[in-house]
Amino acid sequence: MKAVTLLGSTGSIGTQTLDILEQYPDRFRLVGLAAGRNVALLSEQIRRHRPEIVAIQDAAQLSELQAAIADLDNPPLILTGEAGVTEVARYGDAEIVVTGIVGCAGLLPTIAAIEAGKDIALANKETLIAAGPVVLPLLQKHGVTITPADSEHSAIFQCIQGLSTHADFRPAQVVAGLRRILLTASGGAFRDWPVERLSQVTVADALKHPNWSMGRKITVDSATLMNKGLEVIEAHYLFGLDYDYIDIVIHPQSIIHSLIELEDTSVLAQLGWPDMRLPLLYALSWPDRLSTQWSALDLVKAGSLEFREPDHAKYPCMDLAYAAGRKGGTMPAVLNAANEQAVALFLEEQIHFSDIPRLIERACDRHQTEWQQQPSLDDILAYDAWARQFVQASYQSLESVV
């Protein structure tokens, strides 16, 4: 039985992970939970799954959480704040930590789990995007395995299983025989919109993802295609390929989750209904596969599978991500932080949808003079904070988009 800790338990990744643990009580045991501020859902999860330790990021919610579970026998230890979440990440006999915290907030807890020798089911892509130069050496130092828990990188990970033994996979090392990675993208909420309409986008429009049920931030990232750009950087760190050999293709049906091209031009793909539980389950169970009762893919029902080249004019965030990835060093951290802040401003209706890439580009351009090739963790955290402050301070000076 594998002992599991879950970070970000009240979010989309977290609730689906708990569904999996509940379906396989003989395979997984929950050790710890960490969440942001959703006391109602967290208290329900505590009652249902009985973790040993819990952290709530928002310390102001502590008394309410304690009151909500006051009648429990043997209640869990409850911690608060970033320090509490980090302590949960490194706590006890958990063998694997699912990192479902959205954004760069998941970075320090993930590093704490790695330093405690715990394997990582990586749903928080920002860990590698912002801090790949720091995280990759830590994985090797502590002998930790990282398994991707998002659909695209899980698809690639599954496809390369036939190219090497399980012991051969090491992040950032190219698997023998692998030539190219093709990341599929749904195209998000605006894949069928003309570029001219994007200046009219509302928050409600951007949150209407055609295929996946996800959190607000990642749904906006899907609409800008920044999500796919960030996944390109993550794929570079996970699988070691140069950016010239990592491509994006629009696949509206979201049935093929990604593909790999081999040296002999053969192409392998992983297919399935758009269901986040599939990559989460494999990240937890790897190298084993567990039987499920979930709906199997019916190719006849799926019908036609389409592919399109992404429109660079519609999705400028994609090119910004490639440029930041190629620059490396601290630039991906600045890109990621600027995007998080810009998306937050958009969700608060402080900026237009089309302002998101403009703010990100401004931050990356300004960072050129301060860029570092071999940053420390402190450097990455400092530039992450700088990029957020820069976007917050500069958004009001944007000229209106006509």
Curated annotation (Swiss-Prot):
The keyword Phosphoprotein does not apply. InterPro entries: DXP_reductoisomerase (IPR003821), DXP_reductoisomerase_C (IPR013644), DXP_reductoisomerase_N (IPR013512), DXPR_C (IPR026877), DXPR_C_sf (IPR036169), NAD(P)-bd_dom_sf (IPR036291). It catalyses: 2-C-methyl-D-erythritol 4-phosphate + NADP(+) = 1-deoxy-D-xylulose 5-phosphate + NADPH + H(+). Its cofactor is Mg(2+); Mn(2+). Mn(2+) binds at residues 150, 152, 231. Keywords: Isoprene biosynthesis, Manganese, Metal-binding, NADP, Oxidoreductase. NADPH binds at residues 10-13, 36-38, 124, 126, 215. The keyword Mitochondrion does not apply. Its EC number is 1.1.1.267. GO terms for molecular function: 1-deoxy-D-xylulose-5-phosphate reductoisomerase activity; manganese ion binding; NADPH binding. 1-deoxy-D-xylulose 5-phosphate binds at residues 125, 151-152, 186, 209, 222, 227-228, 231. Inhibited by fosmidomycin. It comes from the Bacteria. One of its GO terms (biological process) is isopentenyl diphosphate biosynthetic process, methylerythritol 4-phosphate pathway involved in terpenoid biosynthetic process. Pathway: Isoprenoid biosynthesis; isopentenyl diphosphate biosynthesis via DXP pathway; isopentenyl diphosphate from 1-deoxy-D-xylulose 5-phosphate: step 1/6. It is an enzyme of class 1 (oxidoreductase). NCBIfam families: Dxr (TIGR00243), PRK12464.1 (NF009114). Catalyzes the NADPH-dependent rearrangement and reduction of 1-deoxy-D-xylulose-5-phosphate (DXP) to 2-C-methyl-D-erythritol 4-phosphate (MEP). Belongs to the DXR family. HAMAP family: DXP_reductoisom. This is 1-deoxy-D-xylulose 5-phosphate reductoisomerase.
